[in-house]
Amino acid sequence: MNWTWFHKLGSPKWFYEISGRWLPWFAIGAALLITVGTVWGLAFAPPDYQQGNSFRIIYIHVPAAFLAQSCYVMLAVCGVVGLVWKMKLADVALQAAAPVGAWMTFIALVTGAIWGKPTWGAWWVWDARLTSMLILLFLYFGVIALGQAISNRDSAAKACAVLAIVGVINIPIIKYSVEWWNTLHQPATFTVTEKPAMPAEMWVPLLLMVLGFYCFFGAVVLMRMRLEVLRREARAAWVRNEVKALVEKAS
């Protein structure tokens, strides 16, 4: 197996160049998928036979919850790569993704509360799924706070990596909480291995929204990583040339 691509990821210059090609595709994909998914889900999907139109918040809640968990797994992977292979771009990715993951967790909690009020009769209950998602938000806050509180970049990277790796144990708890404990939450809306329980008119726009959220995540994280690479490599000749070219292009 050719691992050249993996070793190239250790080069900030190579990453900056290749990410510039990926970024527009992620942005375009996010715009198209989210637009189509939102219009289809809110305007054309039929109402649920039990929940009526209140179920439509699923088109925001489920993608945000999926992305919140996936993002934290990414943080843990970046932590392992940073600790084992000493790849500085892993810390760049970790720091760039953490705030996005925190926002997605917050959105999932807020939309869940809005959905829960007409469904359960309460904005919040100490349900296993809700509690573990709240813990996930605090884990994100911890990673962000550690990254900003420790002035030494290497020490901050190690501390954030360790917290991300330790905290990833919360992800299977979130996923399987509805099976391990008696919770108010329903099982997964759809999975890769099973046919969705809802009709295609409902789950297709949901799938589009999930894919759109992931494209949005990719675009935002790449933008944040590119800015951080420029900041950290500010003294490098290639960065000065890049900034000079951008200034000349803008003027």
Predicted regions and their residues:
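Polytopic transmembrane helical bundles with strong interfacial aromatic enrichment
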Residues: 1-251
